[in-house]
């Protein structure tokens, strides 16, 4: 669902110290990145639970990013930053490699002509490879079964290793440390099981 722009709310992005605006930005290797972080529900919960861990959100929609910053400030988080950007530009604006990349409930772009927009299409995988450390892991959650199977195939064809996969995250061992996104809460409340995978290059 499209979010109505709120230009007054978006002004926070120009002044808040949690927003990264000077590039290139040097990441610490232990930084955990969430790409397409939305309102930051999952990553803020992780940051609150792990105060010594560094987190970075990447969200291109300015109004949604503003809502995430409001949430981070309400929780008084100091171990999280946000970049407002399209994912395609990441290698131009960040330096160093990280150990964990989260893809959470990405747009599945179901039409074949939009395959190149899927965040697990080969061009995106090539992008992630450039800033993921050799021992790094990509973690993906989605309610969309077709997108999940597509992602498994795309990653395998790219030469990635599937380290773990399940079609029912909430009834798996991985749920012990799981924090839910807004979409995850919505779909799981309706009885939809959540797909999850971990993969490396």
Swiss-Prot record:
- PROSITE patterns documented for this protein: SAM_MT_TRMB
Binding of substrate: at which residues?
A: 111, 143, 181-184
* MF terms (GO), sorted A to Z: tRNA (guanine(46)-N7)-methyltransferase activity
A GO CC term assigned to this protein in UniProt: tRNA methyltransferase complex
Catalytic activity as recorded in UniProt? guanosine(46) in tRNA + S-adenosyl-L-methionine = N(7)-methylguanosine(46) in tRNA + S-adenosyl-L-homocysteine
- Cite the active-site annotation: 107
Enzyme Commission (EC) number:
2.1.1.33
> What Pfam families is this protein classified in?
Methyltransf_4
Chain positions recorded as S-adenosyl-L-methionine binding sites: 34, 59, 86, 107
What InterPro entries does this protein map onto? Answer: SAM-dependent_MTases_sf (IPR029063), tRNA_(Gua-N-7)_MeTrfase_Trmb (IPR003358), tRNA_methyltr_TrmB_bact (IPR055361)
Give the transmembrane region(s): none
- Write out the pathway annotation from the protein's UniProt entry: tRNA modification; N(7)-methylguanine-tRNA biosynthesis
Q: Does the keyword Ribonucleoprotein apply?
A: no
Q: Which keywords are on file for this protein?
A: Methyltransferase, S-adenosyl-L-methionine, Transferase, tRNA processing
Please describe what this protein does.
Catalyzes the formation of N(7)-methylguanine at position 46 (m7G46) in tRNA.
Provide the family line: Belongs to the class I-like SAM-binding methyltransferase superfamily. TrmB family.
- The protein here is known as tRNA (guanine-N(7)-)-methyltransferase
